[in-house]
Design a protein with these regions (language model features):
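Canonical Rossmann dinucleotide-binding motif of NAD(H)/NADP(H)-dependent dehydrogenases/reductases
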Residues: 1-14
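Conserved glycine-rich Rossmann-like NAD(P)H-binding loop of the short-chain dehydrogenase/reductase
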Residues: 11-25
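The beta1-alpha1 cofactor-binding region of Rossmann-like NAD(H)/NADP(H)-dependent oxidoreductases
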Residues: 20, 41-53, 91
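Substrate-binding pocket helix/loop in short-chain dehydrogenase/reductase
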Residues: 78-86, 90-95
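A glycine/serine/threonine-rich, flexible loop-to-helix segment
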Residues: 81-84, 163-167, 172, 177-190
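Active-site helix of classical SDR
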Residues: 109, 145
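Residue(s) in the substrate-gating loop at a strand-loop-helix junction
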Residues: 129
């Protein structure tokens, strides 16, 4: 919905994602409404893939105005079942949730921020969550990762303003809880 809104307001939107069919569907929806968009396959955990994405974007559009870091998710082993306890968390899945959400925000920020510094301007918007501030029970890994994103955003905003000026902004949004296929079971089975 955000990508479509931005495209309909005149932005040239690049959807970066792993799922080709889903990414192409968003692009086709945007184009059907008169917007401009392309899809590029990426992996937010692989710097070299993101660097190639950036090169392709700059070759196509000449610049990057904004980066919206929205990759993320949760895993069953990083949550606590209704009948479980903290001791049932699986450390390896907890780490995967931290990696995808937090490190999956840091790496794209590193890659795309370099281009914004060259341009002298740009915007980064990171997706945190209300779970960072009011953690729901059961989503320990996700809440910890999103709290990390909020803290990272505050750090990066200060770092960028001090070293590169105020024309590059870094902010976060913290959406509330939306029922999706990814979280339906968690939110509807208390």
């Amino acid at each position: 919905a955000i990508a479509k809104y931005l495209a309909l307001e005149g932005a040239k939107v690049v959807i970066l994602g792993r799922r080709v069919d889903a990414g192409n569907a968003i692009v086709e929806d945007i184009k059907a409404e008169g917007g401009e968009a392309i899809f590029l396959v990426t992996d937010v955990m692989k710097q070299e893939v993101l660097e190639q994405n950036l090169a392709d974007i700059v070759a196509t559009y000449g610049r990057v105005d904004s980066l919206l870091n929205a990759a993320g998710g949760n895993m069953p082993g990083a949550t606590i079942a209704p009948t479980g306890t903290f001791f049932d968390l699986k450390p390896e899945e907890f780490q995967k949730v931290l990696d995808l959400n937090l490190t999956g925000t840091v790496i794209p920020s590193q890659v795309f921020l370099k281009q914004m510094v060259k341009q002298g301007e740009g915007n980064i918007v990171n997706f945190s969550s209300m779970a960072a501030f009011r953690p729901m029970t059961r989503v320990a890994g996700y809440a910890a990762a999103k709290a990390g994103i909020s803290n990272f955003t505050a750090f990066l905003a200060t770092e960028v303003a001090k070293k590169f000026g105020e024309k590059i902004r870094v902010n976060a949004i913290a959406p509330g809880f939306f029922l999706t296929e990814q979280n339906r079971s968690l939110l509807t089975n208390p």
